[in-house]
Amino acid sequence: MLLSDPTPLITVPVIPVVTIARAADAIPLARALLAGGLNVIEITLRTPDALDAARAIIAEVPDIIVGIGTVIRPLDVIHAVDAGADFLVSPGTPASLIQALADAPVPALPGCATVSEAMTLAAFGFPVLKFFPAESSGGVRWLKAVVEPLPEIRFCPTGGVNGDNAASYIAL
């Protein structure tokens, strides 16, 4: 399910971020998420099977929007797009990665942890940013403070969001 813009990513309340050790586990996981009402998934590039897992979900569970995360190098952008990613997610944005994400044919959620990073990424045309690591960077209080002067930017908080604090993030 290819996205031409990131709008669906800001309308879902939760994007599960998963690290899949074995590609064989990908399809059952995706089907379980879909059955539970979650149609977006971010697969991290933290295992050798990550891209194969993404390819399997894209081929077998077409109703899931598949993002590839932990994109940290321009080469990761190429591999993720070649695998069929619907969107890309990075934990941070070194200068070498910003342009690669901006040039990608799919939406990207580049990572930020400061107001300056958020403003820089917005200037590059990114309307949705990954706020990472959310909890240790100020969490809900940071988001409330930043959204006021920067209402045009949407944030996807990740890192430290769990069952104890998720409701406060979803309420934003």
Roles of regions detected by a PLM:
Residues 1-86, 93, 103, 152, ...:
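Conserved N-terminal beta1-alpha1 strand-loop-helix module at the mouth
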Residues 49, 72-171:
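Conserved anion-binding
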